[in-house]
Regions:
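Conserved C-terminal beta-signal and adjacent last beta-strands/turns
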Residues: 189, 200, 244, 536, ...
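Extracytoplasmic beta-strand/coil segments of soluble accessory domains associated
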Residues: 72, 76-116, 135
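Gram-negative outer-membrane beta-barrel transporters
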Residues: 400-407, 494-497, 518-599, 633
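Short acidic/polar hinge/loop motifs at secondary-structure boundaries
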Residues: 113-141, 460
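N-terminal periplasmic accessory domains that precede
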Residues: 71-74, 93-96, 105-108, 124-130, ...
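Periplasmic-side early beta-strands and strand-to-turn transitions of outer-membrane beta-barrels
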Residues: 158, 165-167, 173-175, 187-278
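Flexible loop and strand-edge segments within Gram-negative outer membrane beta-barrel domains
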Residues: 206, 210, 228-234, 248-300, ...
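Outer-membrane beta-barrel signature, preferentially recognizing the C-terminal barrel domain
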Residues: 270-293, 334-337, 386-388, 432, ...
């Protein structure tokens, strides 16, 4: 059955891709160019038309026009990206790219890796971030380990913060609405050719709703008692400063701090609705120096960085009889640290292209502690105290052949202290027909994810002999602009083979003191499908259309069953209407297919349709009122089994800039 689904996916994708190519053939004569610049696809500025990679760019202006309240809402518009939240605002938010695991998505802030070394799978929790002070988000899909190393098996999400430009500017926004929610944002920025600055901060507070069981009829029927609300408080601060003493030298210093204090529930059990709470903190700093040499033929980039993630849990659970339950209460803490330095050189070879090369040294640390409080108090004990250093070398050669063809070939070697050394490669092709606004592209490469510190070195469950997870991925696509740029179409076919995936289970390779099991390289998986996107200016200045669609078949090859939390079909349809000067109305319809919450095709989650709407009106220059409606269809759905989602919600606020 899995094989037939994959064949249907491939056939349908080829048909749709062929249709786009035929449309491109008929578009000759439209003098259009695709000259948007991206930096993630090649570790440096490159016109998107010359990139063979599948990359989506979300600008800060697009985020503002859509009225995205969280970074999660902004990311949901990306084809090939799936995001799940465990019960509303403040809950753990996990991103999967093309069916990969959350820990197989590399997350960068201004080019610096921020995945959490203290988690079991190394994933980044997107609930920490809000879309304030963001200049753009670049989402690069497919294996990218040849450029970025471990964690980039599924792709890369690069969050680029705003850089100050021009006259000093300031902005402020405030809002309030359903579930006792209120938030405020503020930003200042400015700059000249020598110095620039940008600072932003935000705060958000919500009373929320019970993460377990909220608006889930089958659970409320079995557990009719009142549910306690699980609120959340978030704070974020980011700052970036730049100084250029000359045309050939530039310095960039930045940092950010985020705090997410939230309450949470268990997903299962006799008493899942508990007063448990957590506080998560992320702090990161970086300093970058760029020096041009040899008549600007060589650009040298030096980077040092550090980040630290702290997670503190007040875990409360109940067991025993309903008449006299026993309280189990513990305080658990996790700290993940990272410090590193890198060098990158970009050497112009004139007609022979551009050579990018460099190296990196990075040290990661993990500390975890636990202290029992009830029913028997105890002392705080250290469970994990581990560290590892990774040394890497990478190179990428890009060359333009003739007028239209652009090729790249790159590779990387990562050497992890006490673990396996691994090599990865990647090749891309882009055929840019500027006369017709057409780009044909393809890429192939390998990915790898090193075992996390917890998987390798945890005293109870770790396995120091683990090997990296591996993948091979290919994709092919077309980007086409029509009607003088008013319509942009994009289609991509993709296929990934994953092996040596790490699972926890009983295995002969486990140590004698691991009777319950350990982590082992045992699993295999395949993901395939196609991504479609369309942007259209239906009525210039009045009506715009934005569509993203993903078809995904993700199969666990050890069981030939579908992987959990991967819907086969996902679509997002957005309109932007400007019926009068200063008035913008943007409805969005999200359609998500059925999927399974747990492995082995267990806990089926029903499909759903959700309608959101954002409207803003500029009452005077620089001052706007806005209204946002979420889930106006009042759809009852779950992204994770037994965790509720918000019902029909309304929010209103004010924005001002000067």
């Amino acid at each position: 059955m899995a094989g037939s689904a994959g064949r249907r996916t491939l056939s349908g994708g080829i048909f749709l891709l062929s249709s786009l190519i035929l449309a491109a053939t008929g578009a000759a004569g439209n003098e259009i160019t695709l000259r948007e610049i991206v930096v993630t696809a090649t570790r440096g500025p490159q016109a998107i038309a010359r990139s063979g990679s599948a990359v989506t760019v979300i600008t800060g202006e697009e985020i503002a026009r859509a009225g995205a309240r969280t970074l999660n809402e902004a990311l949901r518009r990306v084809p090939g990206l799936d995001l799940t939240e465990s019960g509303g605002t403040g809950a753990t938010a996990s991103v999967r790219l093309r069916g990969g695991e959350p820990g197989q998505t590399l997350v960068l802030i201004d080019g610096v890796r921020v995945n959490d070394p203290s988690t079991g799978n190394g994933q980044f929790d997107f609930s920490l971030l809000v879309p304030t002070g963001i200049e753009r988000i670049e989402v690069l899909r497919g294996p990218q380990s040849a450029l970025y190393g471990s964690d980039a098996m599924g792709g890369v999400v690069n969050i680029i913060t705003r850089k100050g430009r021009g006259e000093p500017r300031a902005a402020i926004a405030a809002e309030g609405g359903s579930y006792g929610s209120r938030g405020v944002q503020a930003a200042v920025s400015g700059g000249d050719p020598r110095f620039n600055y940008a600072i932003s901060l935000n705060g958000y507070d919500t009373a929320g709703f019970s993460r377990w069981g909220y608006r889930i009829g089958r659970l409320r029927a079995r557990h009719p008692w009142p549910l306690e609300n699980d609120g959340a408080r978030r704070f974020g601060l980011s700052a970036r400063f730049g100084f250029s003493p000359s045309e050939d030298v530039a310095f960039d210093v930045g940092g950010s701090a985020y705090v997410n204090a939230t309450q949470y529930d268990a997903a299962f059990g006799a008493f899942p609705d508990t007063p448990s709470s957590s506080v998560q903190r992320l702090g990161q700093v970086h300093a970058r120096a760029t020096v041009h040499a040899f008549d600007r033929r060589l650009k040298n980039t030096f980077l040092v960085y550090a980040n630290r993630t702290e997670r503190d849990y007040r875990s409360i659970s109940y067991y025993g009889s309903t008449a006299a339950p026993v309280t189990d209460w513990s305080k658990d803490g996790y700290v993940g640290g990272r410090v590193g330095a890198s060098y990158q050189g970009d050497l112009s070879l004139d007609a022979f292209g551009l050579l990018t090369f460099g190296g990196q040294v990075e040290r990661e640390t993990l500390t975890s502690t636990s202290q029992p409080v009830l029913p028997v108090p105890g002392l705080r004990t250290t469970l994990d105290d581990a560290a590892q250093t990774t040394r890497s070398l990478f190179a990428l050669h890009q060359i333009a052949l003739a007028e239209h063809l652009n090729l790249s070939l790159g590779g990387r070697i990562d050497d992890i202290e006490g673990a396996d050394r691994f090599a990865t490669w990647r090749a891309t092709l882009a055929y840019d027909i500027a006369e017709s606004g057409t780009v044909l592209r393809a890429s192939a490469g390998t990915g790898a994810k090193a075992p996390t510190l917890y998987q390798r070195l945890d005293p109870l469950y770790g396995n120091a002999a683990l090997s990296p997870e591996r993948s091979f991925g290919i994709d092919a696509g077309i980007d086409q602009k029509l009607f003088d740029g008013r319509l942009t179409l994009s289609g991509t076919l993709f296929l990934n083979r994953l092996r040596d995936l790490i699972n926890f289970q009983s295995d002969p390779s486990c140590r004698p003191d691991q009777p319950f099991g350990c982590y082992v390289n045992v699993a295999r998986a395949d993901t395939s499908g196609f991504e479609l996107a369309a942007k259209a200016e239906l009525i210039p200045g009045r009506l715009g259309l934005d569509i993203a669609y993903t078809n995904l078949v993700a199969i666990d090859r050890t069981t030939d069953l579908r992987l959990a939390r991967r819907p086969e079909n996902t679509a997002r349809i957005g309109l932007t209407l400007t019926p009068a000067p200063g008035l913008v109305i943007a409805p969005t319809l999200v359609l998500v297919d059925a999927r399974y919450s747990a492995a082995h095709e267990k806990d089926r989650l029903a499909p759903y349709a959700r309608l959101d709407l954002f409207a803003s009106y500029e009452v005077s220059e620089g001052v706007s009122l806005f209204l946002r409606g979420e889930n106006l269809t009042d759809a009852r759905y779950e992204e994770v089994k037994n965790y509720g989602t918000a019902g029909r919600s309304l929010y209103a606020g004010l924005k001002a800039s000067w």
